[in-house]
Amino acid sequence: MMKFGFDIDDTLIRLREHAFHIYQRKLNQQVDIEKFHQLERVEIHELFSLNEQEGKQMWEDSLEEIYFTDCPIYPGALETVLQLEELGHEIYYITARPKLHGEQTKAWLRQNEFPVLDSHFFYGMKDNEKMEIIQGLDLDYYVDDKPTVLDTLTKTNTKLLIKDQSYNRNKKSFARIIDWHDFLQNKL
């Protein structure tokens, strides 16, 4: 039996892309999806000609809708997590989502059939605080989309994998998940 840890946003679910479509509707702007797929940073507001402050405000004003509506799950992600659980492995979720949204996030995951134990769900920390939680759990594998998070874990025994995103393609030091369907066959 092994312990698997997963970030949620932009690792298991397409949160930024979901936000992109919400922004298009709210701002009544049509932006080519290819521009989104070429972004070299996490934040998406520049695609809509918003400055940092306006982008932060747009994100905060849209947060409930972004987090708790019909955000798509990456193809194969749910199946991968369910198969790992079925094989007897422990599943942990470690997300930097704010404490205010933790319980609702857990409920959303369950509604979408992700296996979630209360004791295996961690939220409300900053990205740089994830390291302490992940180290304390002594995970065998951890998957995240942010190189800055994974960089803090390179001296641990945890096998680190990065979920492919346009903003992390310059990071070559981690095994990369492009397609969740390939995860079980190729990464273990």
Swiss-Prot record:
Catalytic activity, EC: 3.1.3.-
Q: What is this protein called?
A: Putative nucleotidase OB0422
Q: Which SUPFAM superfamilies match?
A: HAD-like
Matching entries from Pfam families are given as: LNS2_PITM1-3
- On whether Hydrolase is a keyword of this UniProt record, the answer is yes
Q: Which GO terms describe its molecular function?
A: hydrolase activity
What UniProt keywords are attached to this protein's entry? Hydrolase
InterPro entries from the entry? 5_3-deoxyribonucleotidase-like, HAD-like_sf, HAD_sf, Nucleotidase_putative
The answer to whether keyword Lipid biosynthesis applies is no
| Superkingdom of the organism of origin | Bacteria
Q: What class of enzyme is it?
A: hydrolase
Lineage of the source organism?
A: Bacteria, Bacillati, Bacillota, Bacilli, Bacillales
Annotated family? Belongs to the 5'(3')-deoxyribonucleotidase family.
